[in-house]
Amino acid sequence: MIGIIDCGGANLKSLTYALERIKLKYRISKVWSDLSNSRALILPGVSAAGNVMSNIRKLALEDRIRDFNKPVLGICVGMQVLYEHSDEENKTCLGLIPGVVKKFSNPKLAIPHMGWNMVNFLTSEFEDCSGHFYFA
């Protein structure tokens, strides 16, 4: 079973639809005892890093997520809070991934980027993966 952490603001309907299409069982909860036996966690989010971290702390999930020792997938801002810090609202995050989430500073980039675009990988280990990808 996949545990989906409901910390508010996420598009859970789209996520659960995707999991159902690939026939994965899941449970959505804000309560750790419902999620602790999951084989993996998904942390979705639509909001700002500060809001998501505030909700995680209110639900007493911060240390639980850190100590989970199984795969954790972050989607959208859920991915951002897996890092150590976010410059958005200057927030300390979960620290599962070393690094800081920073705003793109190039004014020529359209942010957020939506639609198809070519992706070219700079390392040889991913060169066969280059191609067109859809960004949402």
Question: Predicted regions span which residues?
Answer:
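Short acidic low-complexity segments
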Residues: 1, 26-37
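N-terminal beta1-alpha1 ligand-phosphate binding loop
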Residues: 2-24
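Short gly/ser/thr-rich secondary-structure transition/capping motifs
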Residues: 21-29, 54-56, 116-122
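Structural motif
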Residues: 42-44
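Structural signature of beta-strand start/N-cap positions in the alpha/beta core
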Residues: 40, 71-73, 132
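Amide-donor transfer/coupling interface in amidating biosynthetic enzymes
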Residues: 67, 101-136
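Cysteine-nucleophile active-site neighborhood
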Residues: 47-113
